[in-house]
Curated annotation (Swiss-Prot):
Belongs to the short-chain dehydrogenases/reductases (SDR) family. GO terms for molecular function: oxidoreductase activity. One of its GO terms (cellular component) is membrane. Glycans are attached at N91. Induction: Expression and the subsequent production of PR-toxin take place under static culture conditions (oxygen limited), whereas no expression of the PR-toxin genes occurs under the strongly aerated conditions required for optimal penicillin production. There is a negative control of the transcription of the PR-toxin genes by the penicillin biosynthesis gene product(s), or by a regulatory peptide encoded by a small ORF inside the penicillin gene cluster. It comes from the Eukaryota. This is Short-chain dehydrogenase/reductase prx4. The gene is prx4. The active site is at Y194 (proton acceptor), K198 (lowers pka of active site tyr). It is a single-pass membrane protein. NADP(+) binds at S58, I60, N81, D98, N121, K161, Y194, K198, T229.
Length: 329
């Protein structure tokens, strides 16, 4: 269940009262983020549902696959390498696919045949300090590698495009979940490009959350902070834990992924364009769940509610009017 919202701070309410005195029409933003309690027993049965997961052979993707499978879903694991022996659920199929290859992704989706839930999870970290100078044999500045861009952004966009295309053609709706990162909200200075791309994935969710529901398709993200996977093995996570800093298990993040695909919401994150019904019960959509240690926090609703504060009241009003003018739905 989503908890009751806490009241806004006194200072914020006074600010809103001042604006009302100047005849500015506002809806009071709610000032606190939303903590979530997610348990595997709350996940509904998914018998007959088909789930495709990129980067599904290990880490967060594999953890989500096992949870989906225990709920009765049929799983297709897209990855460059198969899962370790005995780790994949029985009702799963491994499909070799490189998410940077459109041809391989198309073939993987075609082999799956039907898609109800799609999890864009494949990702890599930065291979070297991106903005440090490295030189070739002639002493010239070397072109940097773009694996982190190709896998994390291009691969996610292509995977999402294929998933949405299949869901539209099927005419039965569906759910897309993207593995973003806490660095998309709180960048790491030693991972500048990775952080920027993860911020871009959150932006992709924001950009699509008003258009996909017309096809009964939802799109959400999960933003893991430090999580024990191949990208953050235990020998690196150990010192963080020893210092008392929160570290999540892959299972905990995987549970947030599954929840994002099946949950309901009592209201939209925000309205767009000509929309005027915010308090509309519907599929969980346009949201990001931060996983930090053993805690879950939904981030997007509060950011949207507080938009007039950080974006500016006049800017928010004019931008909304621009969106409505260009909204031809």
């Amino acid at each position: 269940m989503i908890p009751r919202w806490q009241p806004a701070s006194i200072a914020l309410l006074l600010h809103l009262d001042t604006l009302r005195c100047h005849h500015v029409s506002v809806r009071p933003p709610r000032a606190t983020m939303t903590s979530l309690s997610i348990k595997e027993e709350d996940i509904p049965r998914l018998d007959g549902k088909v789930v495709v997961i990129s980067g599904g052979a290990s880490g967060i993707g594999l953890a989500a696959a096992n949870i989906f499978a225990r709920a009765g879903a049929k799983i297709f694991l897209f990855d460059r390498n198969p899962p370790d022996s005995g780790e994949a659920p029985e009702n799963s199929t491994f499909i070799k696919a490189d998410v940077t290859s459109w041809a391989e992704l198309k073939a993987a989706f075609a082999q799956a045949g039907h898609v109800d839930i799609a999890v864009a999870n494949a990702g890599v970290s930065e291979e070297q300090p991106y903005f440090e100078d490295t030189f070739d044999e002639q002493g010239e500045l070397k072109e940097p590698g773009f694996a982190v861009v190709d896998v994390n952004f291009k691969g996610t966009v292509m995977f999402t495009k294929l998933a949405v295309s299949y869901m539209r053609k099927q005419g039965k709706g569906g759910s897309v979940v993207i593995t973003a990162s806490a660095t998309g909200y709180a960048p790491e200075q030693n991972l500048p490009v990775y952080s920027a791309i993860k911020s871009g994935l959150v932006g992709l969710v924001r950009s699509l959350r008003s258009t996909l529901p017309r096809f009964d398709i939802s799109i959400n993200a999960v933003a893991p902070a430090a999580t024990i996977t191949k990208l953050l093995p235990m020998d690196i996570a150990g010192p963080l834990m020893a210092a008392g800093l929160p570290v999540s298990s892959a299972h905990m993040v995987g549970l947030a992924v599954v929840y994002s695909a099946v949950a309901r919401q009592p209201r939209m994150v925000e309205t767009y364009g000509k929309e005027n019904m915010l308090d509309l019960e519907s599929k969980w959509n346009g949201r990001t769940i931060l996983t930090l240690g053993e805690h879950y926090t939904e981030l997007e609703e509060k950011l949207a509610d507080l938009r007039p504060v950080w974006f500016g009241w006049r800017n928010t009003d004019l931008t909304k009017k621009q969106q409505a003018t260009a909204d031809f739905r």
